[in-house]
Amino acid sequence: MTDKVLKRKQLLKVKRKLRTRGKIFGRADKPRVSVFKSNKYFYAQAINDELGVTLASVDGKKLGLGNNKENAKQIANEFATSLKKAKITEVVFDRNGYLYHGVVAAFADTLRENGIKL
């Protein structure tokens, strides 16, 4: 891709991130689940925005799982168990500017299957 196309894609991602982030807010009873995906790994964390603390997190790198749909499902299963240990059953999903497709969608769907209400 040309440099101009890459800059445009990055700008659109930042605009999506700011637009969605302005509308959602995590509380202690309903934290925000923020996802991040790199070229190799997938990460997620539950955040209480009132206090600015992370309540639960999962790291695909520590689990040795790469960034694909099957691994995102395993990461979501691990994350759901850590949320249940923290007695969290309802969350707000922050896709962090990523399109709701592929790995992000597989992660969210698996969280729903594990009884976490998004």
From Swiss-Prot:
<comment type="similarity">
    <text>Belongs to the universal ribosomal protein uL18 family.</text>
</comment>
<dbReference type="Pfam" id="PF00861">
    <property type="entry name" value="Ribosomal_L18p"/>
</dbReference>
<dbReference type="GO" id="GO:0022625">
    <property type="term" value="C:cytosolic large ribosomal subunit"/>
</dbReference>
<keyword id="KW-0689">Ribosomal protein</keyword>
<dbReference type="GO" id="GO:0003735">
    <property type="term" value="F:structural constituent of ribosome"/>
</dbReference>
<protein>
    <recommendedName>
        <fullName>Large ribosomal subunit protein uL18</fullName>
    </recommendedName>
</protein>
<comment type="subunit">
    <text>Part of the 50S ribosomal subunit; part of the 5S rRNA/L5/L18/L25 subcomplex. Contacts the 5S and 23S rRNAs.</text>
</comment>
<keyword id="KW-0687">Ribonucleoprotein</keyword>
<keyword id="KW-0699">rRNA-binding</keyword>
<keyword id="KW-0694">RNA-binding</keyword>
<dbReference type="InterPro" id="IPR004389">
    <property type="entry name" value="Ribosomal_uL18_bac-type"/>
</dbReference>
<dbReference type="InterPro" id="IPR005484">
    <property type="entry name" value="Ribosomal_uL18_bac/euk"/>
</dbReference>
<dbReference type="GO" id="GO:0008097">
    <property type="term" value="F:5S rRNA binding"/>
</dbReference>
<dbReference type="GO" id="GO:0006412">
    <property type="term" value="P:translation"/>
</dbReference>
<comment type="function">
    <text>This is one of the proteins that bind and probably mediate the attachment of the 5S RNA into the large ribosomal subunit, where it forms part of the central protuberance.</text>
</comment>
